[in-house]
């Protein structure tokens, strides 16, 4: 049997058995993933069952106790509170660009972990991501210190527009519908803009996210700690939470309503996530995985307002989520240079093409493969 057909047969079998990942067969199927009642806290519980952190915090193959450090954590106590008992390797790597941070871990070292990491991703010193992170750290020194004020002004402006339009919608008789529309659009834009602040240290703007009736704390789990770190894998909560209504993972036994997900999504979920599954290494560099799993939009990345309110500069944002969106455009040259050097599969598209693409993903039942030379 040709290698491609053989792999597809094995992948289909793994998908049906649900004992391991399809693309990463060395990993067990995520605990609690298919429970009918799903929420961020349950996702954390399932992760704790699989990570071998023994009630502590795991970074790579070592266990640490940050209990005495929690209140002193520069990013806020909440991050450590949420992740206790889990493997935080990806979160630690992505959220700490300064190389001196890793040296501080020695103060809290307890012992080596007893089990291998339940993650396929690597962070080798000469790999794509760590090389990029070192280059970004140096590049940040050349970026104006006040550049993030642009995002602050945009966010504050949208917030004030929401307050004014909401007040007028309730107060005036004429043009009330117009003010309703302005308030609704402002709330939608503000919700996305606040996403910029949820990734970072505790700050007042992240609480504005709650005006959407979503919880910023839950979003920190499902989006920041799950989707950002395990993008488009079985461990991605933003994939598993949509099931059994939407199925982005390909499977031959996908139910009819799953194949008609482009209809379901307009009824159940307002945000679109493009999924791209290609055959890759079973232990990929984390940064290269992010580049492969995401598409940037050339019609969005050229405008600071659009970048902030429409999830722009998505590839760089996924790899350096704590950086303000206004900073990311300065990192394009070094990012593209290293993508070429490491032959990372960086791709750009348009907003329209991505909307069409994510609809096609909900309808797909077969695996995508590529020829490996």
Predicted regions and their residues:
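Well-ordered mid-protein domain cores that form the structural environment of catalytic cofactors
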Residues: 134-138, 142-213
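Membrane-embedded catalytic scaffold of the fatty acid hydroxylase/desaturase
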Residues: 182-371
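Short, flexible loop/turn segments with low-complexity composition
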Residues: 117-119, 150-152, 347-353
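B-type heme-binding environments
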Residues: 1-142
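Amphipathic alpha-helical surface "interface" segments used
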Residues: 120-129, 153-161, 245-252, 357-364
